[in-house]
Amino acid sequence: MKSLTSGVLALGMVLAVTPAFAQAAGEKGPERIVWAAHKTPDSPYTKPNRPIWHIADILKAHQGKQSWDQQILLTRDYDGHYVSMAPGEKTKCMFYADDRVFGWIYSGQVKITIDGQQPFTANKGYLFDVAPRLSYCLENTGTEPVVFYRSTPAGQVPSYPESETPTPIKGWVYGKAKITSTGGYEEPNQPFLDFNAYATGGGKSRDFAFDGHTAAHIIRSGNVKALPPSTSWGHFHENMVEAWVVIEGQLDVLITGEPLVTGELGDVIQANNERWHRATCHPNIGSCTRLAMTPRNKEGQVHYFQTGQPPGN
């Protein structure tokens, strides 16, 4: 009995001097003032990136063509394209090893087939999310071209099921290999969302494509009567680009070093890393929604705000 008491006492002493490693992380901790770095001059926009791509200009550039592919965004994390497929056109089935493919349908309709899921037809306004390691194929089953925005992981080439013939890519060679990993869907991820119906039904802001690398959020905002003052800059991120696809209404974005830009439905707006940015609905047009794209949000993400502005501005 004496030895048991001694053992309990010794254990208590060990626990008393053992550091507490458990510590909850999050974005709603106590407010504190820090020194944060900005590049000087501002982080540049290199091709194909620019503060705003207008869908009207993209469509005009491909006028008379039904099938085309234009890269409009390339960051460390995402490779964003606007794509048009002619009626009857099909893609090969492919997948990405450890990252998602996601996008939004601007016009037309496309049949999307994903491993393990029932094929579905995505019409205008649909969002789609292909989980890693699940092959997917696209087919235009409509009578007009389908135009959509699609994001794939930057710097990564796709893999193909054995039944497909890989498309040659300069600097790469394909060979057969075995894998055992597969993909799947966990909340909040889902293969598709009819955004127009979601919005009509009063749907709120939510995560859509979301994991340890990818973060694509539906951000819905209500009508505003006037823009914030020009002294309100919003926030910025370190070492992280933020971009938006306007999927409802009109969006006004103020970005460091740029004049105020107004995005219409389908436009893509990009704020480079370390640049202040403030996104609001264009005044007096009703609600607006953007598909906001940043990386690494699941583990938390620092938003740097101005010291002289109210919280969140």
Residue ranges of predicted features:
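Ligand-binding loop in jelly-roll beta-barrel domains
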Residues: 132-158, 273-301
